[in-house]
Amino acid sequence: YGGGLKKDFEKAPEINKKTALNFANLLEMIARSKPKIRIRFSTSNPQDMTIDVIKVMSKYPNICKSIHLPVQSGSDRILKKMNRLHTREEYFNLIDKIRKIIPECSISYDMITGFPTETEDDHNLTLSLIDYVKYDFGYMFTYSERPGTLAAKKMEDNISLKVKKRR
């Protein structure tokens, strides 16, 4: 779940395709075979959190009803600049599915403020997303350049530290 076969599944040998497990199947196998252990996994990117995983989580009492779902921004414009693979609407739809299938599920997030070119309107979209989701807790960070990333190479860090901290 993440790298490896997932990225090149169509190019994989047929035997690999036939024997491959997706994360939902693996999670269910472990939950069923080890009912006395408590299972928790962390940080699933929104585009990787499937309805099948959510259903498996709801089915087994030994799987913690907690999902860390990094969103980074509530603005589609900023998400695109960050090269994130989800949109605001897709994130809302995912949250709605989680709340419907596992009403008691705890949801946490990661958020970055002050990404290059972020406007007050972009920031307000992020605040409205936070209000909608009603997270249990989250991790907030101010943007800082990471060497080697596209943002560091191509974008000017044009948001002042004062504004980043206020947001």
What residues fall within each predicted segment?
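Conserved SAM/AdoMet-binding glycine-rich loop
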Residues: 1-120
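Auxiliary Fe-S-binding modules of radical SAM enzymes
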Residues: 31-34, 46, 96-106, 115, ...
